[in-house]
A protein has these predicted regions:
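Small-aliphatic-rich amphipathic alpha-helix that forms the alpha element of a beta-alpha
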Residues: 38-41, 117-176
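N-terminal targeting/leader regions
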Residues: 1-27, 31-39, 48
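A glycine-rich helix N-cap at a beta->alpha junction
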Residues: 75-88, 177-202
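Solvent-exposed alpha-helices and their adjacent loops that cap or buttress functional pockets
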Residues: 46-49, 110-113, 180-184, 205-206
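Glycine/small-residue-rich phosphate/adenosyl-binding loop
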Residues: 56-141
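C-terminal helix-cap and adjacent tail motif
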Residues: 2-4, 14-20, 186-218
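Short loop-to-beta-strand entry elements in the cores of soluble alpha/beta enzymes
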Residues: 47-58
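Glycine-rich, charged/polar anion/phosphate-binding loops
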Residues: 39-41, 102-106, 174-178, 198-199
Length: 218
């Protein structure tokens, strides 16, 4: 797959959360996943610990098992009052956007097992005991840049991704499916990876910068 002709600004502004436009019928070459992960390893990591691990899941039975855990969590999340409140009480424009997000999330939950590659980024050690903000920030700051780098590399190669965490409600069960040593490794997310249906993605609507910008003081 040739690299898409995107400027750095275009790459950063058009790497979207892709759900409905994932090509569920086209295999993803293992070497392409490796290329993206090689680039991900260049991301910064706290104290250069490089405490990341990446589990790539392509086996259909294991993808189905992980997807069933994801669907159980999605069903529970969909029924929460907080989710309903966000859907129905936001201003009209945001409500419409939220409906599209929920619809695409529903689609992903139904079809996750068909996505050819599941990437599960992990951190060495358990994060459950991290009680201070500085420790939590350090841990997540050592994996999120790498995953975002992976997503950017994937986008530039015609692949779509999205950050999901719902399967973590059943992290131990997922660890059993994949042979991950639960007591020593923390799963951080599940990234579906597939070719996209078309490569024409646009910048997303966002609130004006000045509504969230604080300069020198709040």
């Amino acid at each position: 797959m040739p690299i898409l002709n995107l400027t750095p600004d275009e790459l950063l502004s058009t790497t979207r959360s892709v759900r409905k436009r994932l090509d569920l019928t086209r295999p993803v070459e293992p070497e392409l996943v490796r290329e993206c992960l090689e680039l991900a390893l260049q991301a910064p990591t706290g104290s250069n610990t490089q405490s990341w691990q990446f589990v790539v899941v392509t086996d259909p039975e294991k993808r189905m098992a992980i997807s069933e855990l994801y669907r159980q969590s999605w069903t529970a999340y969909r029924a929460t009052p907080q989710r309903a409140a966000r859907t129905y009480t936001d201003p009209t424009e945001r409500r419409q956007t939220m409906k599209r997000v929920i619809d695409s999330s529903e689609y992903l939950a139904e079809h996750l097992h068909e996505v050819p590659v599941h990437l599960i980024p992990c951190i060495t050690g358990r994060l459950d005991h991290l009680s201070t903000t500085i420790m939590q920030a350090g841990a997540w700051g050592s994996i999120l840049p790498a995953v975002w780098s992976f997503m950017l590399a994937a986008r530039s190669r015609g692949l779509g991704t999205t950050w999901t965490t719902l399967h973590l409600a059943y992290e131990r069960e997922a660890a059993d499916v994949l042979g991950i040593p639960y007591d020593k490794i923390t799963q951080c997310a599940l990234i579906p990876v597939a070719y996209t249906l078309g490569t024409n993605f646009s910048p997303a609507p966002r609130e004006p910068l000045d509504s969230v910008l604080h300069w020198d003081k709040w």
